[in-house]
Amino acid sequence: MGFFTSVLGIIGFVIGIPIGLILGFFVLIYSQPSHQEYPPARPLVETSISVLLDLLPDIPLWMKNPDYERVDWFNKFISYMWPYLDKAVCGIIRSSVQPLFADYIGTFCIESIEFENLSLGTLPPTVHGVKFYETNEKELLFEPSIKWAGNPNIVLVLKVLSLRIRVQLVDLQFFAIVRVALKPLLPTFPCFGMVVVSLMEKPHVDFGLKVLGGDLMSIPGLYRYVQETIKRQVSSMYHWPQVLEIPILDSSTASVKKPVGLLHVSILRARNLLKKDLLGTSDPYVKLSLTGEKLPAKKTTIKKRNLNPEWNEHFKLIVKDPNSQVLQLEVFDWDKVGGHDRLGMQMIPLQKINPGERKEFNLDLIKNSNVVMDSGDKKKRGRLEVDLRYVPFREESIKRRKESREEKSSEDDDFLSQAGLLSVAVQSAKDVEGKKKHSNPYAVVLFRGEKKKTKMLKKTRDPRWNEEFQFTLEEPPVKESIRVEVMSKGTGFHFRSKEELGHVDINLDDVVDNGRINQKYHLINSRNGIIHIEIRWTTS
């Protein structure tokens, strides 16, 4: 009898433990307190220092940090707009996740996934302070502190083996400091090309998850595991320097196209050109340009009294879009008096040239680029021989530039022999003043004997030019400098119409090493004048 009693006791123990655990689990997740007591409220001045330290994380940033500003007006705006924002955001969520749900249907015996309810609740997020940054870039940079303790009603229904499983998200909390950059700033509405978002610290995420009516987050250990996993995953994707880029404007219209390469053009020779002069000869020269450029066309020398000229002259043209730009070649007869007669022309799309490949063209000259009008012209206008090579720029990081210069001396020699493009962007100036009451400032860029000017702005001490100039170079400008002068020009009848408001000499070694500098400089011979200049060096 004692043996059977021992066996039954062991069986009862083995069966009782799982049953007890299951019953305890359901009692834990379904039990709700019947009576809740709220703590007494006391004035803040009556609290101790330890209590204040506990409350410190909940105090708005504009109270703790003077760099953060209050944005009550923005919170009111969000509050009034929240019912409409709720529906708009939920509509975007529905359309975005439907394809994801479709991928899971048929796997793990899932027959359907759909939202039974989808609402972000009645409590909008609030911004507890905003910090703005001043940068030298064309961007608007700010950091809002966002807190959202919402009451969303999000119910997802999964149908598995004809069984409906309801999953409900409740009591969502999300606290984060977000860095937002609107860039680049543009003259096209809405005046910025994209929104770049990143998190400055790990976000605080808290929520309840009910499955079949029970709170799954009440299971010991599961809540902390899920919370840490979400923080880790979100931080790995969006914690600075990782960013989320949201394009606003199309790339074709978002910004001014930057140079992407150099087109090396060799004008070799021409044959059997038209006779335009009275003596049966011509004085030909070639004008060459790229479509879509506002820069003046480049010209060869004039070959006097020659219908079969030999030039062998070389030019470099800046390419911004090799897929759409076209090289336009025009042959003119030079005349001392009156306009120059066009002997013929031809056009070469850059798409016909592979990057890095040298290609020679022997072109039949035509009257004009209009195919319909030119088809009726049977006159032979001669031939033009040119040699083309398109060399795209290389995008290199600072680290790669420095490593390439430190690895070998031979590689260093190759680096110093690379041709490239020096771009100088004169952005703006501040507090430039001369002897006269009103200044009409403009900037002059001086480099290797070349002089380039910005437009003149009338009656201002804080001009904004935003103009860029390019210099094509055969080698990097090592141990060289560039001078930028700010001048003022009188608009009336003055004996001394020009006046220098200040200047700056910029060493280009840092530009060659780093590829780019973007700084503000104090003007020499100016009391408080500052000029903002960006310089880029791009190798081909």
From Swiss-Prot:
One of its GO terms (molecular function) is metal ion binding. Residues 67-249 form the SMP-LTD domain. One of its GO terms (cellular component) is membrane. Ca(2+) 1 binds at D277, D283, D333, D335. Keywords: Calcium, Lipid transport, Lipid-binding, Membrane, Metal-binding, Repeat, Transmembrane, Transmembrane helix, Transport. It comes from the Eukaryota. The keyword Aminoacyl-tRNA synthetase does not apply. One of its GO terms (biological process) is lipid transport. It is a single-pass membrane protein. Its main location: membrane. The chain crosses the membrane at residues 9-29. The keyword Metal-binding applies. PROSITE patterns: C2, SMP. InterPro entries: C2_dom, C2_domain_sf, SMP_LBD, Synaptotagmin_plant, Synaptotagmin_SMP. Ca(2+) 2 binds at D277, D333, D335, D341. Residues 240-363, 401-521 form the C2 domain. It is found in: Membrane. Residues 227-509 are annotated as: Phospholipid binding. Its cofactor is Ca(2+). May be involved in membrane trafficking. Belongs to the synaptotagmin family. This is Synaptotagmin-3. It comes from Arabidopsis thaliana (Mouse-ear cress).
